[in-house]
UniProtKB/Swiss-Prot annotation:
This is Small polypeptide DEVIL 7. The lineage of its organism: Eukaryota, Viridiplantae, Streptophyta, Embryophyta, Tracheophyta. Residues 22-53 are annotated as: Required for DVL/RTFL small polypeptide activity. The keyword Cell membrane applies. Residues 1-28 are annotated as: Disordered. Residues 1-16 have a biased composition (Basic and acidic residues). It is a single-pass membrane protein. It comes from Arabidopsis thaliana. The chain crosses the membrane at residues 30-46. One of its GO terms (biological process) is negative regulation of cell population proliferation. It is found in: Cell membrane. Keywords: Cell membrane, Developmental protein, Membrane, Transmembrane, Transmembrane helix. One of its GO terms (cellular component) is plasma membrane. Belongs to the DVL/RTFL small polypeptides family.
Length: 53
């Protein structure tokens, strides 16, 4: 069963989570998930910059 928090406890928990620095492992996991999208965007930018008329 869920516990009920007072407003002060809820604010304190929220501030604790908000100020938590992101870990390098978390950033690596994020980049791993978005790897395909970054690859495609990189290829598109390369084509745009290298196209000559």
């Amino acid at each position: 069963m869920r516990e009920k928090y007072t407003k002060e406890e809820a604010v304190k928990n929220w501030e604790k989570k908000k100020n938590k620095p992101s870990s390098p492992k978390g950033v690596g996991e994020f980049l791993k998930k978005k790897k395909g999208r970054f690859y495609i965007i990189g290829k598109c930018i390369t084509m745009l910059l290298c196209s000559h008329k």
